[in-house]
Amino acid sequence: MKTLLRTLPILLLLISAWARGAGTFVQTPYPPAKAVFDVYLADPHEIDSALYWVRSLFNTLTQAPYNYAPEDLHIVVILHGTEIVTVAQKNETKYREAVERMRYYADLGVKFLVCGQAAEDYGYSVRDFQNFIEVVPNAIAELAHWQQRGYALITPRIYEKRLSIEQIR
């Protein structure tokens, strides 16, 4: 009897683990997005990684099974860190790939906003930026503005990848 009482919990654990099996894919019924991206980066080259966050949301919702038209999505990207140098016209050659990606999304309706206070700190005026950029008075006030209008706040976090997927799998 004692042996049975000791082995019963182990047996139940094994059965429950077997019964659970593999994970389950859930097709969440996402509505068209209303999102504001808060981009404040320590290094302007991190903009490439931050734009993957925009791409991830945009592509998920414009492809099957959702198939939303770009005009159904309401996406705003607010730049107010070192990355604002990437959208200064004089730096276009240096950040060409990032500028082209932002222009592509801007042409599809994504709004790209730059904090006017940050621009001033960097010595930029409105005329210094790419033609798809809108300069707003203040990034923090702008974030509050969009959130009060029902936009979800997304803050890209950029980490240095130290291990490959194969190393940690």
What are these regions (language model features)?
Residues L11-A19:
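Hydrophobic h-region of N-terminal signal peptides that target proteins for export
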